[in-house]
Amino acid sequence: MPSFARIDGTNTVTDIFTLDNQDCLDASGNHSSTIGAAICEQKKAGTWIESAEKNKEGLRGNYAGIGHTYMTGVQTLGVASTDIFMPQPPYPSWTGISTISAEWLPPITRPTETDAEVASHKNYNWDESAYQADNAQGWVLTV
């Protein structure tokens, strides 16, 4: 079932509508985002962007959610310029977006656990306070 996100003037998602598949078909029986967006517009005025088509993965990197941001001209998902929906970053310092997947990147690359650390059930977790105190730090090894 296709879903559509309504965005406000700051490109923040404010509403989500899910439509029946047949509601988005053109006269030839092909899926049409334009038709779906027009149906959403009739229900609630605003700018509507398709988030997911039928039962497929999110069309724009992530499924849209309330509070997510719609971004255009982003180099991600293996293409030079695309549009995506992004949740808020998990931490204030995470401002970069992966060029491979539509996800936020930390300012410092996550270290890889050694075999001994894995065997001891240790892993690296982000510590925003540590990063804010010293921008060369951020990943903390925890149990």
Give names to the regions the model predicted:
Residues 1-143:
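Interaction-interface detector
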